[in-house]
Every structure is written in structure tokens, then in C-alpha cells.
């Protein structure tokens, strides 16, 4: 009698080098995040034209941007449990179709009220796409490279935002703001069919859901041709936590860690958004020109890609909580130091670059940390809820920034205050690292689909 093989999917992925199929999955993930970044950045590029054509105020533009951010938060919060129930691929493809459709609809807006509604609907799709593609890619990444791979795909956000800027510089003068919105919708609608064809469902999700062995085997044969025989009986480890995805995220085993992830990401996005939005206004108030303010803000954002790659690299080499805590701490210190460099444009630019690299990089690294923390059956929910709570921080940053401007605080006081959320990110990571670093899967198994799916 031929002996039945019982391969461990987790170990199979971990012991093999990256295959061509895994690299394709990473590339597709990068593209989804890039489309997300392009679409989210669009409003910033069309805002000056809208003010001229429609005569809208900054307050009205702020409402449109806030509507999109609220949609992003809700899309993230509700999509995670759906992805843990229906599958990552279905949610990703539908969300890409969804935000593509509503972005095209936005191009036909006739007033601010219509645009607010359309951007809210767009935000729902954008919020669903980003955390779930991160979850799917993480489940195909070897654990030794998982953090770096996740930060690589999230670098697609800055790539997409930059592509939006270059597109805007040519399209808007030639064809108007509607053309940029149309492009932002057409690209995801064209890309979604490619995802249907090329993107696989997470093999670890299929294991948890006890999918047919033939379907799992087909994906594994694309990953590692010749390593999986037809005579295979897959098994599943005992569940690391009981209940559905939402109960697992909020359970005694994972609840404290979830709260710390939410705290850190809330404060991290609060910091990045408040600096990205209000930095030009702050530096203009201390005598710098509009051109200098724009250059310094661009330098602040440019540091994010380098910082993200460094964060992922460091997380794969030392304790990830320590790695992110150090990076957030450095970012907070350099942010506070900016308050004492008002007299030197060159020094402010240097400090802004390091601050942006650290804060943006650490925020990207949080996606890798959440993917490492949760088991497969709750990973999409855990990561998406972290994104949703973080987006609330981004929304509140707009109001906090306006309040600080209204108080006419001294330049250095504003940056010292921003040291508080930075300190809270470090404290949250330290607490999670001490009390909820992670929960390895239970070793025992029960008959089902595939073993090692965590």
C-alpha cells in the first residue's frame, strides 16, 4: 500500500525560496496598493482646479476628503470579517471593481454634495482592498522574509500617489480634472480581470476552510512544481483560538494585543496625516516661501519609501516590536527637533526627511506586525480592523491640526505636542511586546485539509 503524504503547507512555504508564482503574487499586490495610492491622492491634485471651477472653499474640500476617509475606515472594518468568511480573493477583486466604478462616477460630479457621496463610496472599496491584499500576500510569504515583502507591496502606495501627480501635471491642463478621475477609475476596472485570472486564493485560507484537496494541490503545484504528489492527504492543526474571526480578535488570547495594535496605528496615522496636511502651513507661518514649503513637504513624504523598506528589513532580523519601537522613537525625536529648526531651511528639510522615513516606515511595518500576530482564520479581520481604527486617527488629525492652528501656538510648541502621540506608539509597542508578542499555533492536529495553516 502506498503511504499517504501529509505535507505541512506552512513549512513548505518557509523552507523553499521564493518561486516565480510567489513573485507574481507580490507584484499583483504591489499593483493593487499602487492603484489604491493613485486614487486616494487624486483629491489633492484636483483641489486647486475645483476651487477655480466650482468656487468651493477649503472647508468644502475638507468635507469631500473626510467623506473618503470615513469610507476608508468603514470599508476596512467591514471587509475583514467578510474576507475571513468568503475568502481574500473575492473581497479584493470586488473592492477593486467597486472603487474603480465609483471613481469614474466621481468624474461626472456636478457639485460638492455629489462628490462627497461618490468619494465616500469610493473610500469603501479603497478601504477594503488595501488590508486584504496585504493579508493574502503575507500568507504566501516565507516567515523569514514576511515583513520585508509586506513593506515592499505597501511601497506601491507612494508609487501610485507619485504616478497620480505626474498624470495630473499632464492631464488636468490638457483635458481637465475629469480626465484624471476617469483614469483613476479605468485603471482598476482594467486590472480587476487580471486579478481574476492570475491571483490565487490564499492557500492557507483554503486549508482552514477545508477546501477540496485537488484545489489546494493545484495551487501548491504552481508554487512548487514537482514537490506535491497526487497521493496526498492534508491535515489541519488544532485551532489556536475558538470562535469566528471577530471573536478571536477580541478574545482573551488576542484582545490586549489587538488594542495595542489599534492604539499604535491610530497614533501613527494621526501623526503622518497631521504632518502631511499641516506642514506647509506651519513652515509658511515662520517665513518660508510657498515653494520652500512644497519642497519640504515632498521631502517629508519621499522618506517614506526608504523608511518602509528599512522597517521591513529590520523586523525580519530583530524582535519586530523592538524594531518598530526604535523607529517610531527616532521619528518622534526628529519631529520634535523640527520645532527648533525654523531658522534653517536645509536643516528643516533634513529633519523632515528622517521624520517622514521613520513615521511612514513604521506605519508600513505595522501591516507586517498585524499579519504576524493573528492566526489565518482571523488575519484579515485583525489587519482590517487595525486599518479601520487607524483611519479614524487620520480623520481626527484634520480637526486637531485646525485647532492647533486656531490657538496660534509657537512653532516649537506644535512639534513638541506631536511628541505625545509618538511616545504613545512606543509605549503601545512595548506593552504588546511584553504581554502579547504572539501566540504560536497549537501543535496537535485533527483530520481536515492541510496542516500548518497559521
Regions found by a protein language model. Give the residues of each.
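C-terminal transmembrane helical hairpin of 12-TM major facilitator-type secondary transporters
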Residues: 310, 315-366
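Conserved MFS/SLC helix-loop-helix module at the cytosolic interface between two early adjacent transmembrane helices
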Residues: 74-112
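Helix-breaking motifs and short loop linkers at transmembrane-helix boundaries and internal kinks
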Residues: 55, 87, 108-114, 125, ...
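Extracytoplasmic gate region of multi-pass secondary transporters
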Residues: 43-44, 250-309
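Intracellular cytosolic loops and amphipathic helices of Major Facilitator Superfamily
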Residues: 1-15, 198-257, 440-454
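Glycine-rich segments within core transmembrane alpha-helices of 12-TM secondary carriers
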Residues: 145-173, 187-188, 387-397
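Cytosolic juxtamembrane N-terminal segment immediately preceding the first transmembrane helix
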Residues: 1-38
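A membrane-interface helix-boundary motif in multi-pass transporters
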Residues: 173-185, 405-420
Amino acid at each position: 500500500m502506498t503511504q499517504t503524504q501529509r505535507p505541512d503547507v506552512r513549512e513548505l512555504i518557509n523552507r523553499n525560496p521564493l518561486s516565480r508564482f510567489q513573485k507574481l503574487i507580490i507584484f499583483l499586490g504591489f499593483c493593487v496598493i499602487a492603484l489604491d495610492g493613485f486614487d486616494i491622492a487624486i483629491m489633492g491634485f484636483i483641489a486647486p482646479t475645483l476651487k477655480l471651477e466650482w468656487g468651493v472653499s477649503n472647508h468644502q474640500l475638507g468635507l469631500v476628503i473626510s467623506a473618503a476617509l470615513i469610507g476608508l475606515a468603514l470599508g476596512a472594518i467591514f471587509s475583514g470579517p467578510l474576507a475571513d468568511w468568503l475568502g481574500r480573493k473575492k473581497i479584493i477583486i470586488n473592492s477593486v471593481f467597486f472603487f474603480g466604478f465609483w471613481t469614474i462616477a466621481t468624474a461626472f460630479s456636478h457639485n460638492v454634495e455629489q462628490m462627497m457621496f461618490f468619494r465616500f463610496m469610493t473610500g469603501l472599496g479603497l478601504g477594503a482592498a488595501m488590508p486584504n491584499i496585504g493579508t493574502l500576500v503575507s500568507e504566501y510569504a516565507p516567515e523569514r522574509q514576511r515583513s520585508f515583502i509586506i513593506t515592499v507591496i505597501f511601497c506601491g502606495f507612494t508609487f501610485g500617489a507619485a504616478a497620480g501627480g505626474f498624470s495630473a501635471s499632464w492631464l488636468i491642463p490638457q483635458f481637465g480634472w475629469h480626465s484624471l478621475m476617469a483614469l483613476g477609475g479605468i485603471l482598476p476596472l482594467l486590472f480587476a480581470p487580471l486579478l481574476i485570472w492570475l491571483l490565487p486564493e490564499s492557500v492557507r485560507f483554503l486549508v482552514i476552510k477545508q477546501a477540496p484537496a485537488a484545489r489546494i494541490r493545484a495551487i501548491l503545484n504552481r508554487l512548487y512544481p514537482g514537490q506535491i504528489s497526487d497521493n496526498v492527504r492534508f491535515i489541519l492543526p488544532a485551532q489556536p483560538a475558538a470562535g469566528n474571526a471577530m471573536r478571536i480578535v477580541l478574545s482573551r488570547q488576542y484582545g490586549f494585543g489587538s488594542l495595542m495594535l489599534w492604539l499604535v496605528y491610530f497614533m501613527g496615522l494621526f501623526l503622518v496625516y497631521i504632518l502631511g496636511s499641516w506642514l506647509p502651513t506651519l513652515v509658511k507661518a515662520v517665513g518660508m516661501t510657498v515653494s520652500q514649503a512644497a519642497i519640504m513637504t515632498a521631502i517629508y513624504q519621499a522618506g517614506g519609501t526608504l523608511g518602509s523598506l528599512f522597517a521591513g528589513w529590520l523586523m525580519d532580523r530583530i524582535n519586530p516590536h523592538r524594531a518598530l519601537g526604535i523607529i517610531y522613537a527616532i521619528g518622534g525625536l526628529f519631529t520634535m527637533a523640527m520645532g527648533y529648526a525654523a531658522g534653517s531651511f536645509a536643516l528643516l528639510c533634513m529633519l523632515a526627511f528622517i521624520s517622514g522615513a521613520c513615521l511612514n516606515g513604521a506605519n508600513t511595518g505595522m501591516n507586517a506586525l498585524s499579519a504576524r500576530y493573528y492566526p489565518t482564520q482571523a488575519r484579515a479581520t485583525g489587519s482590517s480592523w487595525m486599518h479601520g481604527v487607524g483611519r479614524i486617527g487620520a480623520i481626527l488629525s484634520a480637526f486637531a491640526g485646525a485647532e492647533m492652528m486656531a490657538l496660534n501656538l509657537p512653532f516649537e510648541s506644535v512639534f513638541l505636542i506631536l511628541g505625545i502621540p509618538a511616545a504613545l506608539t512606543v509605549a503601545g509597542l512595548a506593552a504588546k511586546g511584553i504581554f502579547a508578542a504572539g501566540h504560536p499555533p497549537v501543535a496537535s492536529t485533527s483530520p481536515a485539509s492541510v496542516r500548518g495553516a497559521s
